UniProtKB/Swiss-Prot annotation:
PANTHER family in the record: FAMILY WITH SEQUENCE SIMILARITY 216 MEMBER A (PTHR16476), PROTEIN FAM216A (PTHR16476:SF1)
Protein name, UniProt field: Protein FAM216A
Superkingdom of origin: Eukaryota
Annotated gene: FAM216A
InterPro entries from the UniProt entry: FAM216 (IPR029373)
A Pfam entry, by short name: FAM216B
Record field: transmembrane: none
The family this protein is said to belong to: Belongs to the FAM216 family.
Annotated Polar residues bias: 1-16
Residue segments, region Disordered: 1-49
Length: 251
């Protein structure tokens, strides 16, 4: 076959690991000498880039032995003194022992909780918010009829404690007095102030809940609620007694 010569030249050249351009030039398959020179220079640049690539450097490093520096404090345990362990294996065991060390885990947990406490101190805590929510729900259930003596009791409660019990009958008498209208049609009297506020609670507004919940705070809170309920019962009894007296006087 007339084409057998070039094919045999191609196989021989390909087995000798030469570039295809050189094989074509030698086998008479076409192509100029300048093209073959350009191809050879391009392959040389590519080979030079491969030699200087990080992968080639990594392969060279794998062939060379590398030293691992292990601290002296980590070489004291008995399990690291086995004669068959290499330095790399000892370093690996040191890292595992550090992870499972109780002191190391305790340090990490302490750091985490300190970070959480620092973040929670910048804004109201969960317990504070929960306590405020409960107090608001309790105050909604403690609504009483809006009367004048209740507001007077709140004003007197802020003052000395002895004056609250002494001034209770006067406040009850004022509460029975009906407000009248003046010439301008505006209401006067004690009840005019109560019209401005809708269903004000008898309970004093609690202290701002910015501290953590404790046993002393809960006890003082319950004691204040009990005192206010007792005062309310006394006022209700005195009011009923005066109403009965006025009813007897009218009859």
């Amino acid at each position: 076959m007339p084409n057998q010569g070039p094919v045999s030249d191609w196989t021989e050249c390909s087995s000798s690991a030469e570039p295809p351009a050189v094989a074509r030039a030698e086998g008479g398959g076409g192509g100029s000498a300048g093209h073959s020179y350009y191809q050879n220079s391009k392959d040389r640049i590519k080979d030079g880039h491969k030699v200087n690539s990080p992968r080639a450097k990594l392969q060279e490093l794998w062939k060379m032995p590398q030293t691992v520096h292990t601290p002296k404090s980590m070489t004291e345990p008995s399990f690291l003194k086995h004669p068959d362990l290499t330095l790399v294996e000892k370093h690996y065991l040191c890292s595992v022992a550090k992870i499972y060390n109780a002191n190391y885990l305790r340090t990490l947990m302490k750091r985490h909780y300190m970070h959480v406490i620092q973040r929670s101190s910048q804004k109201p805590g969960v317990l504070t918010h929960h306590r405020g929510h409960l107090s608001s729900r309790y105050s909604q259930k403690q609504h009483y009829p809006c009367t004048t003596w209740r507001h007077q009791l709140e004003r007197e409660d802020l003052g000395p404690p002895n004056t609250a019990a002494a001034s209770a009958p006067e406040m009850i008498q004022h509460s029975l007095w009906r407000p009248v209208r003046n010439k301008e049609g505006l209401k006067t009297g004690y009840a005019s102030k109560t019209r401005c506020k809708s269903l004000k609670i008898f309970r004093k507004p609690g202290r701002p809940f910015m501290q953590s919940v404790s046993a002393n705070d809960s006890e003082s809170y319950m004691n204040e609620e009990k005192k206010e309920e007792d005062l309310l019962n006394k006022c209700m009894q005195s009011m009923s007694i005066e109403e009965q007296g006025e009813h007897l006087m009218l009859t």
